[in-house]
UniProtKB/Swiss-Prot annotation:
It catalyses: UDP-N-acetyl-alpha-D-mannosaminouronate + N-acetyl-alpha-D-glucosaminyl-di-trans,octa-cis-undecaprenyl diphosphate = beta-D-ManNAcA-(1->4)-alpha-D-GlcNAc-di-trans,octa-cis-undecaprenyl diphosphate + UDP + H(+). This is UDP-N-acetyl-D-mannosaminuronic acid transferase. GO terms for biological process: enterobacterial common antigen biosynthetic process. GO terms for molecular function: lipopolysaccharide N-acetylmannosaminouronosyltransferase activity. It comes from the Bacteria. HAMAP family: WecG_RffM (MF_01001). InterPro entries: UDP-ManNAcA_Trfase_WecG, WecG_TagA_CpsF. Catalyzes the synthesis of Und-PP-GlcNAc-ManNAcA (Lipid II), the second lipid-linked intermediate involved in enterobacterial common antigen (ECA) synthesis. It comes from Citrobacter koseri (strain ATCC BAA-895 / CDC 4225-83 / SGSC4696). Pathway: Bacterial outer membrane biogenesis; enterobacterial common antigen biosynthesis. The lineage of its organism: Bacteria, Pseudomonadati, Pseudomonadota, Gammaproteobacteria, Enterobacterales. Signal peptide: none annotated. It is an enzyme of class 2 (transferase).
Length: 246
């Protein structure tokens, strides 16, 4: 019988990535034995690996996260190339967040939301409650001052949240999660970037077929040609992949 509550680790450029077979495996792992895992979830794609290579602060933030998983198809292919026996699949962060929220709603797990524009955050809360009856115990939009951070951490701690999701983009969200965990370590933290915008329909995600083919990056590039400079950086990652330098 396959064990769905544990998962192997695979090393790419020194980063230890969790090898989830599929979304159900990820959920069973995070909710093992009816207990929500505690720690920080960080989605890893090729761009984030490049940033971690060049920025020691980002590298330290990622290294400190307990649950690093393959969000990008390039990373999945690299794991499979380096470890031919690996049964690992892409788990998109946006999809994982929705599945976590659905599971949290089913089990009554308390959730705290951070980030996004005020109106987007309000719509996210309303939709989560309507769709999955999520127990949202608090929220804070992304427009707060540095001197308000400590008060936010105290609010999160007082709320008793077991899941805290932060939509502020990298590395801001990773920094906030790291600092908040000092005050409130008894939760699963997840950085979700622009997920609230996608969830509420403010930003259109790539059609399912593009996602299935691993071409979500191309869809975003065609939709936003200004991303070309960011995409050209990925040539360095391709060199790592094809020269076996992972």
């Amino acid at each position: 019988m396959t064990d769905n509550t544990t998962a192997p680790l695979y090393s790419l450029r020194g980063l230890q990535l969790i090898g989830w077979r599929d979304m159900q495996h990820a959920l069973n792992y995070l909710f093992a034995d009816g207990q929500m895992k505690q720690g920080t979830l960080v989605a890893i794609n090729a761009e984030k690996m490049l940033t971690a290579e060049d920025d020691p602060e980002v590298r330290a933030l990622i290294d400190a996260a307990e649950f690093k998983y393959a969000d990008g198809i390039s990373v999945v292919r690299s794991v499979r190339k380096k470890f031919p026996q690996a049964q690992v699949s892409r788990v998109a962060g946006a999809d994982l967040w929705e599945e976590l929220m659905a599971r949290a709603g089913k089990e009554g797990t308390p959730v705290f939301l951070v980030g996004g524009k005020p109106e987007v955050l309000a719509q996210t809360e309303a939709k989560l409650r309507a769709q999955w009856n999520v127990n949202i115990v608090g929220s804070q939009d992304g427009y707060f001052k540095p001197e308000q951070r400590q008060a936010l951490f105290e609010r999160i701690h007082a709320s008793g949240a077991k899941i805290v999701t932060v939509a502020m983009g990298s590395p801001k969200q990773e920094i906030l999660m790291r600092d908040c965990r000092v005050i409130h370590p008894q939760a699963l933290y997840m950085g979700v970037g622009g997920t609230y915008d996608v969830f509420t329909g403010h930003v259109k995600r790539a059609p399912k077929m593009w996602q299935t083919l691993g071409l979500e990056w191309l869809y975003r590039l065609l939709s936003q040609p200004s991303r070309i400079t960011r995409q050209l950086r990925l040539l360095r990652y391709l060199r790592w992949h094809y020269t076996g330098n992972l």
